Amino acid sequence: MSKSSSALLIREAQPQDVSLILDFIRALAVYEREPDAVTATEADLLRDGFGAQPYFHCLIAEHDAGDGGRPAGFAFYFFNYSTWTGRPGLYLEDLFVQPEFRGLGVGKALLARVAAIAVEKNCPRLQWEVLDWNTPAVDFYASLGASFLDEWRNVRMTGEALRKLAALDAALDSAGAVAKNEVEA
C-alpha cells in the first residue's frame, strides 16, 4: 500500500530498504542522545521484518516522489494485544523525520498512515513512547489529540537481569516447582 501526493510518497518498506531503515534507526538514536545504543544489523532487520512471520512493519516516506524520491522519514511498528479490550493494538516503536524535512507534514502523514492501519486492522488503540525532553514531539502529539499516560511507568529488563530471570525458569522447572508446556515461537 502506498499513499502519495506530488511531494510525498508513503510506502511499505521492502527487503532492499534494510540499509535505509538502519540509517533511520541510527539517526533517531543520535537525536535521542543514545548514538551508541543501536546494535541491530541489516541482517537482523531482514530476518525479523521480511520473513515468513514478520515481527515488525515499516513505512518509508519519500519526499519529491515525482523525482524518484528522497528518503525523508520512517515509521516502525508492530501489533500487540490488549487483554483489557480483547483486541489487537498497534505499537509505534519509532517515528523519525530527517531534519531537512521537518515542518513539511512528513511526520503527520506517517503518523496518519499508521493510524489508518490501526483502524483498518480493528485496533482500538495506537500507542507509543516519547522522551520527556523532546518537547517538539510532545507538542506535536498533543496537537493531534494524543493523551499522555503519566501514571504509567515504562519497564524494561535487559542483559544480566534478563538472563538471571530466565535462569530462574529453568531452576524452578528442574526443582519440579513449575511444570511447563513447550510452546513454539
Feature roles, as predicted:
Residues 60, 69-78:
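Conserved beta-strand in the GNAT
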Residues 22-48:
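Conserved GNAT-fold acetyl-CoA-binding loop/helix
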Residues 47-60, 91:
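A short helix-loop-beta-strand connector motif used in the catalytic cores of GNAT acetyltransferases and
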Residues 119-129:
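Conserved GNAT acetyl-CoA-binding A-motif
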Residues 128-137, 156-160:
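Conserved beta-strand-loop-alpha-helix junction that forms the acyl-donor binding cleft
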Residues 108, 112, 120, 132-151, ...:
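Conserved active-site alpha-helix within GNAT-family acetyltransferase domains
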